[in-house]
C-alpha cells in the first residue's frame, strides 16, 4: 500500500568506499535535509555542506535536491553524498530518522517511481536486472528494457490488439453492418500480424530470461568420472579437488561462469554412490534436490567407448537415484577421457565426447549447451525478461491461437473474448492491471535504497 510518508536508505553497496550516498524521498525530504545540513537547498544544485545530528557535525559532502516531479521517484528527493564509511552513513540515517523519516523497504524507491508513473512495471524490474546483471550482454539488454524498448514493443502490440477488438465488438453490437468474419480481410490480416508479433516477442523473451537469470547446469555421474575436472575446464580455473580417489568432491561446488555472455550456474554434486560417510550421504541428498531444479543435466561418464549409453543406463549405475530424475529434463551424456583413444567418435544427438583434463571438445560442449536452451545470440533484438513475462507472453500466445480458431469458425463473440484475454495478459507485463500481491513480490526482491 503506497503511503506518502518520507523514506530514507543507503543507496550505495555495503562496505567501505570513497563515497556513500543516502537517499531521502517523500513530502518532508527537503525539510529533513535542510535540518540535517542547516542550509537552504536549491533544486538541482550540488551544495557542499556539513551534515549534522542536532549541533554535532557527522560529516561533510555534496547534497542535491530534486524537486517533484522531476526526480527518480516522482516525489521530492534529496541525495546526500558523504564519505563511504558505514558508521558515518548509519549516523546520517539515524539523524534522518530522528527528523521524521522512516527506513525504506526493499525496492520502495523504485516502487514509488512505478506508482507515480515514472516507470512502468517492466522498466522497474529492469532496474533490478541492470544492478544484478552478471555479464556485459545481460547489462546491455537490461539497459534496453530500462529505456523502455520492451515496454514499447508491448504497448505497440496492445494498440493493434485493442483496435482489432474494438472493430470486432462493434461488428457484433451493430449487426446491420453485416460483417462476415470469415471473409473480412481486415480482421484476418490484423489478427495474423498480431500473431506474428506475439510469436517474435515470445522468442525474444526466452532469450531475455536466459540472459537475466542464466542457465543452471548440474554435473552428475559416477565417482571419479571426471565431473570436477569438467567443472574446472568449463570455468577455466580450479574450483574442486581433483584426485584419483572416488568420492573426493564431498559437497556441492558452485561455479558462475559465462559462455558467449550467457551466465552459467554450474553445480558439481557429490559423487553418487552408496556411502556410510555422513557428509558424503548429505551431499547425495543435495545432489538430488539440485537436479530437480536444474535446466540441464550433464551426465559425465568415463565409458568413452560406448556411444550407445542412454538415459535408462543411469538406473544400472545408480538405481536409487534414477527415480529422482525428472523424465522430461534435458540430459547430455558427456563421454570424458577420450584422450585415451586413438580414434575419437563423432558427437551425435545428446552425446558429446571430451577430455576435460586436456581441454578437448570443451568448446563444442559449450556450443551444445547453448543450443539446447535455444539461445541464438541475437543481441540487437534481446531485452531482459523474467519468468513472469514469459508466462504472460506464452499465455497470450495460446489465446491468440484460440482467437484464430474462433475466427475460422466465424464466432465473433468468442473471438472478442479471446482478444480480451490476450490484452489482459499483455497488460500484466507493463503493470496496467497488477495486483498488490504481485507488486509486493516484485519490489521485495530489490536491494534497500533502490
Swiss-Prot record:
Function statement: Exhibits a very high intrinsic GTPase hydrolysis rate. Involved in the addition of a carboxymethylaminomethyl (cmnm) group at the wobble position (U34) of certain tRNAs, forming tRNA-cmnm(5)s(2)U34.
Cellular-component GO terms for this entry: cytosol
Subunit relationships: Homodimer. Heterotetramer of two MnmE and two MnmG subunits.
UniProt binding sites for K(+): 224, 243, 245, 248
Binding site for (6S)-5-formyl-5,6,7,8-tetrahydrofolate: 23, 79, 118, 450
Organism: Francisella tularensis subsp. tularensis (strain WY96-3418)
Binding-site residues for Mg(2+), renumbered to this chain: 228, 249
Spans traversing the lipid bilayer: none
Record keywords: Cytoplasm, GTP-binding, Hydrolase, Magnesium, Metal-binding, Nucleotide-binding, Potassium, tRNA processing
PANTHER family: TRNA MODIFICATION GTPASE GTPBP3 (PTHR42714), TRNA MODIFICATION GTPASE GTPBP3, MITOCHONDRIAL (PTHR42714:SF2)
GO BP annotations listed: tRNA methylation; tRNA wobble uridine modification
Residue sites binding GTP per the record: 224-229, 243-249, 268-271
Top-rank lineage group of the source organism: Bacteria
Cofactor info, note text: Binds 1 potassium ion per subunit.
InterPro entries recorded: G_TrmE (IPR031168), GTP-bd (IPR006073), GTP-bd_TrmE_N (IPR018948), GTPase_MnmE (IPR004520), MnmE_dom2 (IPR027368), MnmE_helical (IPR025867), P-loop_NTPase (IPR027417), Small_GTP-bd (IPR005225)
EC main group: hydrolase
Cofactor(s) this protein cannot do without: K(+)
Name of the molecule in the record: tRNA modification GTPase MnmE
Predominant location category: cytoplasm
Protein family membership: Belongs to the TRAFAC class TrmE-Era-EngA-EngB-Septin-like GTPase superfamily. TrmE GTPase family.
Record localization: Cytoplasm
Database matches in NCBIfam families: mnmE_trmE_thdF, PRK05291.1-3, small_GTP
Pfam families: MMR_HSR1 (PF01926), MnmE_helical (PF12631), TrmE_N (PF10396)
Molecular-function GO terms, alphabetical: GTP binding; GTPase activity; metal ion binding
Domain TrmE-type G: 214-374
EC numbers for this chain: 3.6.-.-
